[in-house]
């Protein structure tokens, strides 16, 4: 039987505020455990929450960027459940009247642009973080994250493959970053998602029972988790006639490469939602709506159009650059510093992106300052170093944040342009590569490429390639 995959995502994005949603505690990441807490966010008796105005501002901004209807009158609700990371034993969220309804995100697919509908955007407070110790019978709790404001962006089940889900996340991340709503640092947990997935017979319009997958913290893990769950459900249907998937919450175990059962999936009634009695309904005024529209910065679609007009780059290069605001910003700063746009793109999308992936470095934390990158490229242009040596220098710059001139001096990588020194290397290579020399003299001009490579190898990448080629041609023509 052929199946169609149905996927919907619930994306949590922490808002870029300096303080928490209901108190003055800092939201800064990386503090000592339980340092950024107070009686309010810990829910101690006698404390009352005060809604952070900037939270409403950023939530409205998210709704505007994502084409939502802004509900001018909305309210906060209590979501009741017990878990160690929730000190109040309830979470202040939004239930039946969220701040934003509807909306959509347009994603690229192999068949063109696809519109993925949104169900809603609502405001809520984040929970704490459980730290599970290996080989220990207990866990630790860090409450710093309790009360950090976030928006939950809920999609409709419009995605039909793990690849589409990843594109949705990438596009959404770019939108939120560009609008300065969230930094979306998945490595720090400021953007997370739960995935809902089910299968149905191709051609069917009915939805089957969905499974929710939690513990997904990167685009790569999202794709893997959905692919594995897709395969698991397909096998259950194929080998068990009349089988019905049970509604449950599963956790992605990246170590084992599979989803594992956490608990039976709850319904809204299980959470006993009721209006938050300590916070009055939220009224979104027309002045705020106007302010949000006026301050909306350049969004990814607009930046893409500008890049196509302003820079001589291919569409795929532009797509990768604008996908990540910090990366696109780095590119533009490098071009502003005097670097040619194609050269800047080649370095960023080549060696830089490779090292970022290998070291899991976030684009907001690139260890090579723009001015150092520009210096390196200038050193190649002025023939102070070869392209081969430049790659070695860049790797060291990425590891240490040192200036390129310092690395070149430490490693002795200055390009050899002294003709007498190169002449000796050229003669050595000619004397030791008789076959290639004879091939060249017999008319196989491509043989000179091999000889140039041998000189570069002998010089450990420091010889000036154009000078080497010129000297080889001169000697071989005598």
UniProtKB/Swiss-Prot annotation:
Database matches in PROSITE patterns: GATB
Reaction catalysed by this enzyme: L-glutamyl-tRNA(Gln) + L-glutamine + ATP + H2O = L-glutaminyl-tRNA(Gln) + L-glutamate + ADP + phosphate + H(+); L-aspartyl-tRNA(Asn) + L-glutamine + ATP + H2O = L-asparaginyl-tRNA(Asn) + L-glutamate + ADP + phosphate + 2 H(+)
SUPFAM superfamilies membership: GatB/YqeY motif, Glutamine synthetase/guanido kinase
Pfam families: GatB_N, GatB_Yqey
GO biological process: translation
GO molecular function: asparaginyl-tRNA synthase (glutamine-hydrolyzing) activity; ATP binding; glutaminyl-tRNA synthase (glutamine-hydrolyzing) activity
Segments crossing the lipid bilayer: none
E.C. numbers: 6.3.5.-
UniProt xrefs under InterPro entries: Asn/Gln-tRNA_amidoTrfase_suB/E, Asn/Gln-tRNA_Trfase_suB/E_cat, Asn/Gln_amidotransferase, Asn/Gln_tRNA_amidoTrase-B-like, GatB, GatB_C_1, GatB_Yqey_C_2, Gln-tRNA_amidoTrfase_suB_CS
Enzyme class (EC, first level): ligase
Keywords of this entry: ATP-binding, Ligase, Nucleotide-binding, Protein biosynthesis
Family under the similarity heading: Belongs to the GatB/GatE family. GatB subfamily.
Complex and partners: Heterotrimer of A, B and C subunits.
PANTHER family the record matches: GLUTAMYL-TRNA GLN AMIDOTRANSFERASE SUBUNIT B MITOCHONDRIAL AND PROKARYOTIC PET112-RELATED (PTHR11659)
Function: Allows the formation of correctly charged Asn-tRNA(Asn) or Gln-tRNA(Gln) through the transamidation of misacylated Asp-tRNA(Asn) or Glu-tRNA(Gln) in organisms which lack either or both of asparaginyl-tRNA or glutaminyl-tRNA synthetases. The reaction takes place in the presence of glutamine and ATP through an activated phospho-Asp-tRNA(Asn) or phospho-Glu-tRNA(Gln).
UniProt protein name: Aspartyl/glutamyl-tRNA(Asn/Gln) amidotransferase subunit B 2
């Amino acid at each position: 039987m052929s199946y169609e995959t149905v996927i919907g995502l619930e994306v949590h994005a922490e808002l870029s505020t300096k303080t928490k949603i209901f108190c003055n505690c800092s939201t800064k990441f990386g503090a000592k455990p339980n340092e950024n807490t107070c009686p309010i966010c810990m829910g101690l008796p006698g404390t009352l929450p005060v809604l952070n105005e900037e939270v409403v501002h950023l939530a409205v901004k998210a709704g505007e960027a994502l084409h939502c209807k802004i509900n001018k009158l909305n309210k906060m609700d209590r979501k009741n459940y017990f878990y160690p990371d929730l000190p109040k034993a309830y979470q202040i969220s939004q239930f039946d009247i969220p701040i934003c309804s509807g909306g959509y995100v347009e994603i690229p697919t192999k068949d063109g642009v696809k519109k993925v509908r949104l169900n809603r955007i609502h405001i809520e407070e984040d929970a704490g973080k459980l730290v599970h110790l290996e080989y220990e019978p207990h866990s630790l709790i860090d409450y710093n994250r309790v009360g950090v404001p976030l928006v939950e962006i809920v999609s409709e089940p419009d995605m039909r493959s793990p690849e589409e889900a990843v594109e949705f996340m990438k596009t959404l991340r770019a939108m939120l970053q560009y609008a300065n709503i969230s930094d979306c640092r998945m490595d720090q947990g400021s953007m997370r998602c739960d995935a809902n997935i089910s299968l149905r017979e191709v051609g069917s319009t009915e939805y089957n029972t969905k499974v929710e997958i939690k513990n997904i913290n990167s685009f790569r893990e999202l794709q893997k988790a959905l692919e594995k769950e897709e395969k698991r459900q397909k096998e259950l249907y194929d080998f068990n006639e009349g089988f019905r998937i049970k509604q449950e919450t599963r956790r992605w175990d990246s170590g084992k490469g599979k989803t594992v059962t956490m608990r039976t999936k709850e319904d809204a009634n299980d959470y006993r939602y009721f209006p938050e009695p300590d916070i009055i309904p939220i009224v979104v005024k027309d002045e705020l709506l106007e302010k949000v529209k006026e301050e909306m910065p350049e969004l990814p679609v607009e930046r893409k159009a500008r890049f196509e007009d302003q820079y001589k780059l291919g569409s795929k290069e532009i797509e990768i650059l604008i996908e990540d605001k910090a990366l696109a910003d780095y590119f533009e700063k490098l071009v502003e510093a005097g670097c040619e746009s194609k050269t800047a793109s080649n370095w960023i999308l080549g060696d830089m992106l490779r090292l970022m992936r290998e070291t899991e470095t976030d684009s907001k934390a690139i260890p090579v300052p723009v001015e150092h990158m520009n210096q390196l490229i200038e050193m190649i242009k002025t023939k102070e170093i070869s392209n081969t040596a430049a790659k070695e220098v860049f790797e060291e710059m990425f590891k240490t944040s040192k200036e390129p001139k310092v690395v070149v001096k430490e490693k002795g990588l200055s390009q050899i342009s002294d003709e007498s020194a190169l002449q000796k290397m050229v003669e050595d290579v000619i004397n030791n590569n008789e076959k290639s020399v004879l091939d060249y003299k017999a008319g196989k001009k491509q043989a000179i490429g091999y000889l140039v490579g041998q000189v570069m190898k002998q010089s450990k990448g420091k010889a000036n390639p154009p000078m080497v080629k010129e000297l080889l041609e001169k000697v071989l023509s005598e």
